[in-house]
Amino acid sequence: MFLAYPSSRELVTLATSADSEQNFSDGEVMAMLTELEVNGKRYPVNYPADTPLLYVLRDELGLTGSKYGCGEGQCGACAVLIGGAPRRSCQIPVSAAAGKPVVTIEGLEKDGRLHPVQQAFLDAGAFQCAYCTSGMIMSSVGLLQTNPNPSQADIVQFLQGNVCRCGTHPRIIDAVRQAAKMMREQGR
């Protein structure tokens, strides 16, 4: 089963209330030109300010690693790093991401080498259907940036907002611990 979400182009024609400050005719929402820094590159994007960052990443930039799960910020499938911290891109308006570095799952790999968290997830087999994996990895990277030697309780607490319906949490926890060790050994 695939979850559908409105395309960002469909959002441009969403109806606004009659008493809106923006007074647009025919119920259109005005798009605005914004510059995003994603995975170290700058992109001009033209969307309504309240368009979820997830839609812009997927529809405009073609970065489909971040997944649409619930659209309510409850599952973590859409997690990206904004300013180094994990955030739910389905809940972040594109205007709030302007001027801040955004990193998606596609931006973790460097020079053909996986990030230690990505490698640890592969080594531990920390996925089944893999729908949640990019969000789990991005949240784990955020954790390890702030806590390079987390306990099992720290990992469980930090990832409690990421849902894995396949039940691979024990392997995910093992992967985060392995990644922490690799990162310490590499001096990251």
Spans of features found by a protein language model:
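Cationic, low-complexity basic patches in intrinsically disordered or flexible, solvent-exposed regions
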Residues: 11, 22
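Ala/Thr-enriched low-complexity intrinsically disordered regions
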Residues: 4, 13-18
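Generic alpha-helix initiation/capping and coil-helix boundary signal
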Residues: 8-9, 133
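N-terminal export signals
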Residues: 1-8
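Signature of N-terminal electron-transfer/Fe-S-associated modules in redox systems
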Residues: 2, 23-188
